């Protein structure tokens, strides 16, 4: 069943439907869920690049006791969302890109 759930959450990202963001966040935050499923949800959030995922991704990364696949995927997704939103802001104003990554 784990493979089916991984496929389901990653497919939500590929469908590019931002209505899935709240559900993906809940899966990712669920400590009782398999870590590979949670990592799949984190990856899908990175594909969707929705700002609503930034805080939950940040919390997962900061509260991690160790850096495994879940945390690594969350960090990559966080960076993707930050980069996408930074590029969108560039058109609105001229600012220097932060160097915190």
Predicted regions and their residues:
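N-terminal cationic amphipathic segment used for targeting or macromolecule association
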Residues: 6, 18, 39-42, 51, ...
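Eukaryotic tandem repeat interaction scaffolds
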Residues: 1-15, 19, 23-24
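Amphipathic alpha-helical interaction elements
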Residues: 13, 29, 33, 46-49, ...
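Amphipathic alpha-helical scaffolding segments comprising HEAT/armadillo-like alpha-solenoid repeats
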Residues: 17-29, 50-62, 85-96
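Alpha-helix N-cap/helix-start positions at coil->helix boundaries
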Residues: 2-3, 18, 33-36, 51, ...
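Alpha-solenoid helical repeat scaffolds
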Residues: 7, 23, 36, 40, ...
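Core register positions within helices of long alpha-helical scaffolds
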Residues: 11-14, 44, 73, 77-80, ...
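Short, solvent-exposed mixed-charge patches
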Residues: 100-101
């Amino acid at each position: 069943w784990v493979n089916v759930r991984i496929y389901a959450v990653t497919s939500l990202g590929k469908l590019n439907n931002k209505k899935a963001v709240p559900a993906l966040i809940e899966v990712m935050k669920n400590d009782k869920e398999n870590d590979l499923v949670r990592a799949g949800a984190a990856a899908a959030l990175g594909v969707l690049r929705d700002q609503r995922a930034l805080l939950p991704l940040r919390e997962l990364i900061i509260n991690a006791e160790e850096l495994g696949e879940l945390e690594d995927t969350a960090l990559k997704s966080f960076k993707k969302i930050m980069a996408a939103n930074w590029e969108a802001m560039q058109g609105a104003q001229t600012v220097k890109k932060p160097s915190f990554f």
